[in-house]
Amino acid sequence: MIFGIGTDMIEINRVVKACERKTFLTKIYTEQEQKLLLSDIRKAASNFAVKEAVVKMFGTGFRAIAPNEIEVLRDNLGKPYVNLYGNAEILAKEHNVERIHVSITNTKELVSAYVIGEIIRE
């Protein structure tokens, strides 16, 4: 059953520019994500869009969840997936959200992310 959906679109250059500030990187991205960004800084925008989509899926915005409590990584084939920590993980457990499906698409200037939170059991 679907718990919720979330979507976001962001300008890639805006996020890339913000990543020039170390404080932005540590506030927004986990250590694993920061390692990923070393190989492709444009992934910073993709990950940020996914984080925004996840908090929209929960209906909380970043009031209840810190951005670095949502980790966006890629599997061996490049498919994005989400790990939740802290308040994000607690919120998912409270609502029985066991799976978050992620889709990312981009142009040269924009990136869009779409997530679906799935309840496997009630």
UniProtKB/Swiss-Prot annotation:
HAMAP family: AcpS. Its EC number is 2.7.8.7. Transfers the 4'-phosphopantetheine moiety from coenzyme A to a Ser of acyl-carrier-protein. This is Holo-[acyl-carrier-protein] synthase. It is an enzyme of class 2 (transferase). The lineage of its organism: Bacteria, Bacillati, Bacillota, Clostridia, Lachnospirales. The gene is acpS. One of its GO terms (biological process) is fatty acid biosynthetic process. Its main location: cytoplasm. It is found in: Cytoplasm. One of its GO terms (cellular component) is cytoplasm. Pfam families: ACPS.
